[in-house]
Amino acid sequence: MNELMKILGQGGQSLSFDQIKIQMASPEQIRSWSYGEIKKPETINYRTFKPERDGLFCARIFGPIKDYECLCGKYKRMKFRGIVCEKCGVEVTLAKVRRERMGHIELASPVAHIWFLKSLPSRIGLMVDLTLKELEKILYFENYVVLEPGLTDLKLHQLLTEEQLLNKQDEFGDDAFRAGIGAEAIKSVLEGIDIDEDKVRLRAELKETTSETKRKKLVKRLKLIEAFAESGAKPEWMILDVVPVIPPELRPLVPLDGGRFATSDLNDLYRRVINRNNRLKRLIELRAPDIIVRNEKRMLQESVDALFDNGRRGRAITGANKRPLKSLSDMLKGKQGRFRQNLLGKRVDYSGRSVIVVGPEMKLHQCGLPKKMALELFKPFIYSKLEKYGHATTIKAAKRMVEKERPEVWDILEEVIREHPVMLNRAPTLHRLGIQAFEPVLIEGKAIQLHPLVTTAFNADFDGDQMAVHVPLSLEAQLEARVLMMSTNNILSPANGKPIIVPSQDIVLGLYYLSLETPEFRNTPDDKAQAFGTLGEIEAALHARTVTLHTKIRARLHTVDDQGSPIRVRVVTTPGRMLIAQILPRHPNVPFALINKQLTKKNVSDVIDAVYRHCGQKECVIFADRLMGLGFGQAAKAGISFGKDDLIIPAEKQEMIEKTAGEVKEFEQQYQDGLITAGERYNKVVDAWSRCTDEVAGAMMKEISKQELGRPINSVWMMSHSGARGSPAQMRQLAGMRGLMAKPSGEIIEQPIIANFKEGLSVLEYFNSTHGARKGLADTALKTANSGYLTRRLVDVAQDCIIVENDCGTERGLTVRAVMDGGEVVSSLSERILGRTLSEDVLDPTTNKILYPRNTLIEEEHAEKIEKAGIEVVKIRSVLTCESTVGVCGHCYGRDLARGTPVNIGEAVGVIAAQSIGEPGTQLTMRTFHIGGAAQRGAEQSSVEASHDGIVTVKNRNVVLNSQNVAIVMSRNCEIVLADEKGRERARYRVPYGARLLTDEGAQVTRAQKLAEWDPYTLPIITERAGKVEYLDLLDGVTLVERMDEVTGLTSKVVVDYKQNARGVDLRPRLQLKDESGDVVRLSNNTDARYFLSPDSILSVENGAEVNAGDVLARIPREGSKTRDITGGLPRVAELFEARRPKDHAVIAETDGRVEFGKDYKAKRRIIVKNDETGEETEYLIPKGKHVSVQEGDFVRLGDPLVDGPRVPHDILKVLGVEALSDYLVNEIQDVYRLQGVKINDKHIEVIVRQMLQKVEILDPGDTMYLIGEQVDRLEFEAENRKREREGERPAVAMPVLQGITKASLQTQSFISAASFQETTRVLTEAATAGKVDTLNGLKENVIVGRLIPAGTGSVMNRLRRIASGQDEAKGVGQETPRLSGQEAAE
C-alpha cells in the first residue's frame, strides 16, 4: 500500500478537512517545515544555469530541476526514485516538489515581526505595555530598556538613552541592574510574561478600575492575552529567530532572451536578508565594536521588515528601476493579490468571445454559435467521437482531421452539440442573469446570435457588444446549466419577481400599433361594426383592404369558460387585437379583456406575468416567442417614423414665458423693497421657472397627443406612450423648453434655457447647457466604479446568508403597512406582503373570522383579498426576526422571486440580495438631478391638496386663530388624515408648524381641494397669545445686528451667532410677551411665553410692539436650497448601508416628556427632557448654532426630533428598536430607487440589514466571561446565555449594534472571507494572534479553498457528506468517506 502511495505521489496529509486554523509559527515549527538552511545569497550560476548549492534556489534543499534527475546527472529515470545522489546531494523525485518545499534562514540576532509590531493596535506593544514609539526606539537601537531594576531607583521597562545608561552604571555599578536594547531585549520581556497569571491580575484590575480610558486599555490587553492563552501560542514567537523561505517555484527566476533574467522581487528581498545576516555573523565572530554590530542588527531588522511588508515602516526598498519591491504582504493584498486574482477569480479554458448580433428567428432557449468557435470549443468531444466511429485511429489523426476541417468533422460537430448547452456571459456581470445557458445552433459567420428577449437581462445592445461563451464539461455541470441556468428558466427577475423577458422597443411599438385605439374606432357605435365569424374571414378582409388593423369589428372568439371547457364568445375588438388573441394561451384566468386594449410596455409585461402565473413556464416561453415575432413583423409593416415637424411646439409657449418673466420681475421688486431676502428671491425665481417649464411641457404633450379623425396619430407620441423609446422629459427638451440648468457645483442657474432643440439654442444658452452635460459625462465614469464597489461590499457582507431550514418556528415578525408619500400610495400593502409568510392570523375586520392562518405564504389572490377586506396592517415574518442559527429559514424569507415558488433550502439569498441592490446601482445618479444636465427639482411644496374625496380628521391638532380668523397650526407633528365613508384611511399628510389650516376636523372635502398652505422658505416663530413684545438679551452689536441690504437699502434685525463674541457667551437671546399688568403671559402648557431665537433669525416685531395670537414674531430663512443638498442616489444608498452618521443629523428624544432648557455651556445648549410620570431626566447637549425645533414646555414623544435633520440609524435602533430601524432603512433606500423607477423587493434590503445587526454590545456581563462594552457575535452570545441559564448562573445583558457593511464584512466569523475582502494584513494579524479557526461556512471561504460552495447543489453534497460522516462515526470507521450507495444517496 505504501509503495503504491509513493508511486501516486500522494503527500502524507489527507486532503479532506472541515476547518482551517491560522496561528503564529514557533521557531521549531518553521525549522520542521524546512528542508535545509540557506546560507548563501546566490541564486543560480550564470554560466551553467544550475542553482548554487546552499543558495536561494539550491536543488539539495528544494529538490531537482528536472523530473527524476539529479543535478549532476548521475541518476536519471523513474527507477532511481527516492535515492539521494551522493555527489550533489539531490533527491531524485518530481520537480514539482520545488513548489512545496521550504527552506529557512537562521538569524544571528532575533528580529521583530513587523505585522505584530506595526499593525494597529500593536500586538507586541499591548503585550509588553509600551507604546509603538517606545518600542521602535528599542527595536531600532536608539534607547535601552530596563529589564531588571534591582535595588536602583529605575522602574521596570523604563527607557534610557545611552548617556543615561552610562550615568546610572557609574552611579550604581554595572551589575546592580539589567538593561537591554534591540529585539533581544523585547524578546526577554516577552519571555518573562506569565499568561495565566496576567489573566487573573487583569480581571481583578478591571473590577476595581473606575476610569473609562484605563478600562478600555485593560480590556484590549486582556482580550489579547486571552487569545494567546486559548491558542496556545507564546508571546515570544512574535520575535523571529528563524525566517522561513518560500519554495523557489513561487518566486521564479526566468531567463529572458538576450542572456538577462527576470526575477521575482522576493529573491532580492531574501538576498538582502541573507547578506546582512552573514555579515552580522562575521562581525560577531570578529568581536567587532558594539556600535558596528548594532548598526548591522538594525539593518537586518529593516531587511526582514521589508521582506514581510515593504514600505510599512520607513521608505520602501526599491529595485533597480526605482520601483518599490513587492513583499510577501503585497502578494496577498488588493485586486492583484493572491486572494482576489488567483483564488476568487480564476480564468477557465473552453471559452471564447465574439461580437453579438440579433437572432430573431431563434427560439428563446437557443443561441447562434459560429461554426469556427464551436469547432474549437468542442474539440475533445469531437476527437472522442471521431475515434468511436472509426474515422480516426488515434487522437493525433483526429486532430489532423479537425485541423483540415474534413466534411465528416462537421457532421460529428452537429451531433456533439445537440443537447449540450453552452453558457453565455456579458461583462459586467452585475447579477446572476448576466450568465445564462442556451442550446447552440451552428451558424455561418463569426458573430454570436443572441435572442432579442434576453437582452434586458444581459443589459446588452447590438452596437458592438461582445459576449463570452463557456462550455460546461462534466455531466453535472451540463445538468445544472440545463435545469437551473437555461434562459427559459429565468423568466422572472430575482430582484422584484416581475418578468424580465419582456418585449422592448420595436416589439412594443409593433404590438402597440396592432392594438391601437383610433378616433375612428371610438366614433363607430358597436352595433354598426362589421361582424366576422372566423379568423380566416378577418384575414381575408384585411387582405382585401375592406378593414384595417384598427377598424372596430365584432368577432367570434374561441376561448374557455371557468371550468376550462371550450366556448365561443362574441367580442367587440379590432382585427389587430384578434391577431394577438390568436397566440394567447387559452385559460380561464387569462381573459381576452387582458389584451383588448391599447398595449403599452407595462400592459404587455402584465400579460406575460399573468400567462406565467396561470399557464406555467412552458406556455409562457412559447407565448413570449410568438409575441416577439408578431411585434417585429407588425413594426416592420407599420413603418412608423417621424420627422422634425412631428415635434410640435405649443402655441401658448410664448405667453407662458412672458407671464413667468413678469413674475420674476415682481420678485425682483419685492426684493428691492426689502420684503424678501436674497435667498428667498432666488428660491422663488427658480420655482417660478421650474413651474413654467412643466406647464410648457404639459401644453406640448397635450398638443402632440391630440387625436383627430382623418389625421394620423403622432409617431413621437406613439413611441413615448407605448414605452418603446423616449420619455416626456426628453420630448420636453426637443419641443418644449430646456428649462433650468445646474452648475457643476449643484447650484441652479436662475436664468433658464427658454429655447428647445428644435428652435435651436443661442450661444449663451448653449454655453450654459454644456456645464451640466459635461458634468453628466464625468459623473457616469465615477458612477460605474462606485456602483461596482458598493456591490462588492454588499456581496461580501451577505455571502454567508443561505437558506438552511424550512421553518425556524419563531413567533416574531414585522408589521407592514402601505407606504404613503404626500398622500399618494407609493407602495400598496398587497405589493409589500406578496410572497411573504404571515406571522399572525389575519382576521376579517367585518366578521372577525380568520381569513388566513399564520404561516400562510401570501400569493397574488391572497394579497388582493386582504387589500379588498380593508385590512391596513399585516404582520409578516422576516429574515430580520428569523431565529435560525446559521443562515435563515425558508418561512421567514418567503417566496423565491425568480421562480414564484417557496424558496428552496440551499438558496444563496444573501448574494441574490446583494446583486439585486447593486445591479441597478449604475442607473442611480451620483447626485439628485440630471437629464442631460437639466436641473430637476420640484417646486418646493407649499400646500397640501386632497388626493381623494373624504372626511378630514386632524391628528395632534393644536391651532390658534389669528387676526384674520385663520387657523394657524401650532403643533410640531400635526397630520391631516383623509378617510372614506367606511372610515378607512385613504391618505395622510404632514402639516408643518406655522401652516394656515384651510379645513378642520370632520369637514367633507373633494379631490384637489387645498387643505393647508405655508411658506416653504422660512420657519416662523408664532405666538399663541396676544401681548406686548419685550426683547431679552438682544443687545445691538452683540446678539443683534441691523443688516442693511446693499441693493434695496432696507434694514432688517438679524440675530447673529453670538458664541464667537466674548460678551455674548452667556446670553440667550429671546422674546417674551407681557400682558397689560406687565406680567409675563402664561401659555396653555403652563410655561412662560418666552421664545428662544437661534442665529440667523430675522425679527418681524419691534421691541414693545403689541401682537395678536397667531402673529409671526420672527422667521428663520431656510437657505437657498441648492438642488436640495440631500445626498441622493448612490452616495445615499452607500451612506445608509455603511451606517454613517449624516452631517447635521437630528437629535431624537429617548423618552416621552416635557422639554426644558438647562444652563448653557460655552458652545452648547442644554436641553432636558423630563418624564412627568417617572420623573427621570435625559440631557442633550446641542451646539449653539443649530436650530432647536422645540420650544420650552413642549411635550415630546419617544423618537421625536429635538433638532431637525436626517435621523441617525444608530439612534433609531437604540431608542425605537430593530423593527423601526428596518422600517427606516428599507423606506429610505427604496425612496432612492423609486426615484429612478427601479423596483426592488423589500426582503433583499432586509437580508442586508440582518447582516448589519450581527453583533451585540455587552452592557452587563453577568456570570459570563465577557467584558463590558465588548462586541460579540449575536449567535455566540445567545448560545453562551443559554448555557449560563442551564447552569443556573446570571446571563449577560446586551444591546444590538448596527455596523456598516464594510465593518460587518471585516468582522465575520471567517477570517479567510474577511482577508480576501479588505485590509488583508490587519485581518490576518488579528486572526493569527487569536489562533482563529475558520469552519468554512460561507461561500467565499469554500471558493478560496477550492470546494463546492455550501449553497444550491453544493448544499446537497454537504448534507450527504454530513450524513455519511455521521454513519461512519456510528460504525466506528475511519475518516475516509465511503462512496454512498444509491439507496443512501437517494435519502
From Swiss-Prot:
GO terms for biological process: DNA-templated transcription. It holds the Pfam family RNA_pol_Rpb1_3. One of its GO terms (cellular component) is DNA-directed RNA polymerase complex. Its EC number is 2.7.7.6. SUPFAM superfamilies: beta and beta-prime subunits of DNA dependent RNA-polymerase. Residues 1367-1387 are annotated as: Disordered. It catalyses: RNA(n) + a ribonucleoside 5'-triphosphate = RNA(n+1) + diphosphate. Zn(2+) 1 binds at C70, C72, C85, C88. Zn(2+) 2 binds at C808, C882, C889, C892. GO terms for molecular function: DNA binding; DNA-directed RNA polymerase activity; magnesium ion binding; zinc ion binding. The RNAP catalytic core consists of 2 alpha, 1 beta, 1 beta' and 1 omega subunit. When a sigma factor is associated with the core the holoenzyme is formed, which can initiate transcription. This is DNA-directed RNA polymerase subunit beta'. It comes from Granulibacter bethesdensis (strain ATCC BAA-1260 / CGDNIH1). The gene is rpoC.
